[in-house]
């Protein structure tokens, strides 16, 4: 739930391991 992945996922996917897409940013926990 924290936007600490430093990645956006406007396309719907995250490349960073352990991160999920909470549009439009990738989040972890």
Swiss-Prot record:
Cross-link (Cyclopeptide (Gly-Asp)): 1-29
Source superkingdom: Eukaryota
Residue stretches in coiled coil: none
Keywords: Disulfide bond, Knottin, Plant defense
Upper lineage: Eukaryota, Viridiplantae, Streptophyta, Embryophyta, Tracheophyta
Keyword field contains Disulfide bond: yes
UniProt cross-references to InterPro entries, sorted A to Z: Cyclotide, Cyclotide_moebius_CS, Cyclotide_sf
Protein name: Kalata-B4
Organism: Oldenlandia affinis
Record's comment describing the protein's domains: The presence of a 'disulfide through disulfide knot' structurally defines this protein as a knottin.
Disulphide-bonded residues: 5-19, 9-21, 14-26
Assigned protein family: Belongs to the cyclotide family. Moebius subfamily.
One BP annotation, GO: defense response
PTM characteristics: This is a cyclic peptide.
Stated role: Probably participates in a plant defense mechanism.
């Amino acid at each position: 739930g924290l936007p600490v992945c430093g990645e956006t996922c406007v396309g719907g996917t995250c490349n960073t391991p352990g991160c999920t897409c909470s549009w439009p940013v990738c989040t972890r926990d």
